[in-house]
Amino acid sequence: MTLLFKLVKIAILVFLMVIGFFIFIGSFWLNTYQTAQWADLLASSDASGIILTIFPNINSWFNATVANQPVLFKTMVHFFIPVGFGLLFGLIIAIIVDILYRLTKYAIKRSYQSN
């Protein structure tokens, strides 16, 4: 039973990471949820979402990172930087939800012990 519980918990955390990833790429980086356009937008354009409000210089940093590199490297980095940030954002969301779950579970357990 504990193995099944752990697998379900891992599946839920992966699901939360995917949701966080979609939120980051859709809202923060590209400002669109039309996933069919994501590959073209990631390869050709800079960030255009909410992230520009939070970090106004991110496009200049992003372009300076790949300025003197070969075309293949530029193409890979145009995908990996936003995807990496998206996965990190998803991981943070999953960790926060896990912490809130554990705190709620602890609070419920404490309330039953005090009665």
UniProtKB/Swiss-Prot annotation:
Entry's transmembrane regions: 10-30, 47-67, 77-97
Annotated membrane topology: Multi-pass membrane protein
Keyword Transmembrane helix belongs to the record: yes
Keyword set includes Nucleotide-binding: no
A GO CC term attached to the entry: plasma membrane
Cellular compartment(s): Cell membrane
Entry-linked InterPro entries: MPN454_MG319
UniProt keywords, alphabetically: Cell membrane, Membrane, Transmembrane, Transmembrane helix
Listed NCBIfam families: MPN385, MPN454_MG319
UniProt name for this protein: Uncharacterized protein MG267
